[in-house]
Curated annotation (Swiss-Prot):
EC numbers for this chain: 3.1.13.1
Family according to the record: Belongs to the RNR ribonuclease family. RNase II subfamily.
Keyword RNA-binding part of the UniProt annotation: yes
Gene (UniProt): rnb
Catalytic reaction list: Exonucleolytic cleavage in the 3'- to 5'-direction to yield nucleoside 5'-phosphates
Ranges of residues in domain S1 motif: 561-643
Keywords: Cytoplasm, Exonuclease, Hydrolase, Nuclease, RNA-binding
Keyword RNA-binding among record annotations: yes
Function: Involved in mRNA degradation. Hydrolyzes single-stranded polyribonucleotides processively in the 3' to 5' direction.
UniProt-annotated location(s): Cytoplasm
Biological process terms in GO annotation: mRNA catabolic process
UniProt-recorded Gene Ontology molecular function terms: exoribonuclease II activity; RNA binding
Protein name listed in UniProt: Exoribonuclease 2
Length: 644
């Protein structure tokens, strides 16, 4: 009787349209219930039975029920699932398999089976890539996944590397392919094999892509020739090797090993500027005046060189600082080192006065055993030899940026616009509360940005600098010349690492067109999108492997009284994140560890401070002593506690 009743259908429609709904993201908790977060201010409770229909991170539309002053959300429609492709650990065996996603907030096992054509018999503990196939909000009875790739067995010592690379869908090995002969590019190569070029790298480096030569000129001027490995002499644009390099975009440097952008035969041999081997290069000759200014007579040219020495950072630094046993093998090499140190000094001063110089942070290096175990983690400070190479590379990249801009009007540029204009007023207001007065318009210009950075660098601590970081925009890769505020430069285009960066290979081809006086085609914008995405994935992979290795390294320190100096890097409602000064590990200090009485404690991300009873006790950039309370291997998280 009620079937197909138009009045009833209308009533249903009316009720549906009058029921309040909200769209948001599901946040799971460890207690079974969850929340629908609509925005920063508003969230709704999701009871445990309703949480069975959704997963942490799902974007959904939910019906909002109100009972006795309490609102709760009932998931109704899936907008975007949190999980599509993921990695996890297999449980069970044969025909009754489940997979637990490798994610700190996803604890439930998802029923699964191997995809057709996947020839691996999965067993308990195996790591796999899976794809979600069913979801309760899509009308399915339950969650269900399909195993699409076997990664490795559970006890493999190299799990951190293989699982991380699979998670981010990155290559595990060097690309295939060989380059047998150099291309005929119609370039005249200058013979510089008699000059005393040197390379300065880590002792273990095989892919040397830069060699340096310096000489003194009259009037207190110095000449610097930067010679860069020339992979585009072997790899034709559009060839198979070129396409593979374009997809990879960068060499992926992970703790313990790298996955090169080019075949190892090229990166570590044919193109590598090895000592006493004749190699083709792309070179830049520049003149530096007494105050370190790069004069206008910049010259790019093709050449052949023969590096006369493979020097090592620490040995060169020791020698320049008059320590250690090492010394250059000849007076000619010693003279090169002295001249390069002079160039470094001049360029450093020029950048300090006219651009911006980054504060030196140490690099952290994992020392690994045969089975991937972490033997030690050492902080490697940036010493004089590192700075010699850095200053030479920055100078060479400034030269390329100018030449490409003036001769072609395009290239692959690193662009950083400083502060987001939308944040300028808030930035000025924040600085004012700390006694620094800036003009909201001026700070958006390169000069204004540099002026502010110098004032911040002169502050006694980095606290204020950390407060304004959130107002900064991100660096981008662009085909259009533009300023790099972070470096304090009008334009910056890298070409000094073509073995490990595809963008540098593109700039090589453009510079060669300039040398030959030919026209060139502007690179397509999608290549910059691919490069930015790959850079993001590689950084995430490096961080993920690092987190795993840090957890392994610090596991036996948990619960002991071993003290570590730690810098506070972030404060949130839930506690503080700190970086251990000696090894670079990131640890979390939960709010209850800071003060037992929650009502007396205020952790403010906005102000970067922790207050107890109204007194500021901790702030971002403070260095405090901590002990390791717990290391959770399944989430690779390190929990620390301040030393009372």
């Amino acid at each position: 009787m009620f079937q197909d009743n138009p009045l009833l259908a209308q009533l249903k429609q009316q009720l549906h349209s009058q029921t309040p709904r909200a769209e948001g993201v599901v946040k799971a908790t460890e207690k079974g219930f969850g929340f629908l977060e609509v925005d920063a201010q508003k969230s709704y409770f999701i009871p445990p039975p309703q949480m069975k229909k959704v997963m942490h991170g799902d974007r959904i539309i939910a019906v909002i029920h109100s009972e006795k002053e309490r609102e709760s959300a009932e998931p109704e429609e899936l907008v975007e699932p949190f999980l599509t492709r993921f990695v996890g650990k297999v449980q069970g065996k044969n025909d009754r398999l489940t997979i637990v996603p490798d994610h700190p907030l996803l604890k439930d096992a998802i029923p699964c089976r191997a995809a057709r054509g996947l020839n691996h018999e999965f067993k308990e503990g195996d790591w796999a890539v899976a794809e979600m196939r069913r979801h309760p909000l899509k009308g399915d009875r339950s969650f269900y996944a399909e195993l699409t790739q076997y990664i490795t067995f559970g006890d493999d010592h190299f799990v951190p590397w293989w699982v991380t690379l699979a998670r981010h869908n990155l290559e595990k090995e060097a690309p295939d392919g060989v380059a047998t002969e150099m291309l005929d590019e119609g370039l005249v190569r200058e013979d510089l094999t008699s000059l005393d070029f040197v390379t300065i790298d880590s002792a273990s480096t095989e892919d040397m892509d830069d060699a340096l030569f310096a000489k003194a000129l009259p009037d207190d001027k110095l000449q610097l020739i930067v010679a860069i490995a020339d992979p585009t002499a072997w790899i034709a644009e559009g060839s198979k090797l070129d396409k593979a390099a374009k997809i990879r975009a960068f060499t992926n440097y992970l703790p313990g090993f790298n996955i090169p952008m080019l075949p190892r035969e090229l990166s570590d041999d044919l193109c590598s500027l090895r000592a006493n081997e004749v190699r083709p290069v792309l070179a830049c000759r520049m003149t530096l005046s007494a105050d370190g200014t790069i004069e206008d007579n910049i010259e790019f040219f093709a050449a052949t060189i023969e590096s006369k020495a493979k020097l090592v950072y620490d040995q060169v630094s020791d020698w320049l600082e008059n320590t250690g046993d090492w010394k250059p093998e000849s007076e000619a090499i010693a003279e090169q080192v002295r001249l390069l140190a002079q160039i470094c000094q001049r360029r450093g001063e020029w950048r300090h006065n006219h651009a911006l110089v980054f504060k030196d942070r140490p690099d952290y290096r994992f020392i690994l055993g045969e089975k991937g175990e972490v033997l030690d983690i050492v902080a490697e400070p940036r010493r004089i030899a590192n700075r010699i190479v850095e200053e030479a590379m920055i100078a060479a990249n400034i030269c390329a940026a100018r030449v490409l801009r003036d001769k072609l009007g395009f290239g692959i540029y690193n662009v950083h616009m400083g502060f987001d204009p939308a944040n300028a007023d808030a930035l000025a207001a924040l600085l004012k509360t700390h006694g620094l007065h800036v003009d909201a318009e001026e700070v958006l210009t390169l000069d204004g940005f540099c002026k502010l950075r110098r004032e911040l660098d002169a502050q006694p601590t980095g606290f204020l600098d950390s407060r304004i970081r959130r107002f900064q925009s991100f660096a981008e890769i662009s085909t259009e010349p533009g300023p790099h505020f972070g470096l304090g430069l009008e334009a910056y285009a890298t070409w000094t690492s073509p073995i490990r960066k595809y963008g540098d290979m593109i700039n090589h081809r453009l510079l060669k067109a300039v040398i030959k006086g030919e026209t060139a085609t502007r690179p397509q914008d999608e290549i910059t999108v691919q490069m930015a995405e790959r850079r993001r994935l590689n950084r995430m992979a490096e961080r993920d492997v690092g987190d795993w290795l840090y957890a392994r390294f610090l596991k036996d320190k948990a619960g002991t009284g071993t003290r570590f100096a730690a810098e506070i890097v972030d404060i949130s409602r839930g506690g503080m994140r700190v970086r251990l000064v000696d090894n670079g590990a990131i640890a979390f200090i939960p709010a209850p560890f800071l003060h037992a009485v929650r009502d007396e404690l205020v952790c403010s991300q906005e102000n970067g401070t922790v207050q107890i009873k109204g007194e500021t006790v901790y702030k971002v950039t403070d260095v405090i002593d901590v002990t390791i309370a717990e290391v959770r291997m399944e989430t690779r998280s390190i929990i620390a506690r301040p030393v009372a």
